[in-house]
């Protein structure tokens, strides 16, 4: 049984301003995939959520390969955004309508992926690779 560890990050210059997302996927401490993408004008929070959604959509696309080739049975997400992690886990109330839409999309993707998924907040220093991809 292998865990897929996914580190995501998002940021904007200006908040709102030009924004980017990034993420890195690891299995057994080996990098298997990474992404970075400009997302136009957005807030930092929007970028954090869009990074997570992008990662979930990529996992959904690669679900068969992850299950068959890599024997992934569990997914762990890591983010330095305390707000994102606690809102996705249901610990913090979501007031913003756009964030509510992101949460619904995340939960829908979780159901489609149909594997155990957990979310963890980490210090910014432990998210350097995803942060680097945001700032390319």
Predicted regions and their residues:
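Alpha-helix C-terminal capping segments
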Residues: 1, 133-136
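RNase H-like nuclease fold core
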Residues: 1-46, 57-58
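RNase H catalytic domain
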Residues: 11, 15, 53-134
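Short, conserved alpha-helix that lines the donor NDP-sugar binding/gating region
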Residues: 48, 52
């Amino acid at each position: 049984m292998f865990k897929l560890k996914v580190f995501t990050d998002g940021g904007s210059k200006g908040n709102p301003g030009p924004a980017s997302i990034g993420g890195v996927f690891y299995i057994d401490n080996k990098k298997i995939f990474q992404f970075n993408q400009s997302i136009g004008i957005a807030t930092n929070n929007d970028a954090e959520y869009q990074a997570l959604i992008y990662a979930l959509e990529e996992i959904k696309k690669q679900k068969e390969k992850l299950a068959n080739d890599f024997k992934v049975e569990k997914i762990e997400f890591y983010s330095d955004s305390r707000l994102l992690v606690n809102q996705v886990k249901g610990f913090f109330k979501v007031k913003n309508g756009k964030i509510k839409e992101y949460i619904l999309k995340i939960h829908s993707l979780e159901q489609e992926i149909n594997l155990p998924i957990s979310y963890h907040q980490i210090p910014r220093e432990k998210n350097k690779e995803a942060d680097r991809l945001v700032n390319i």
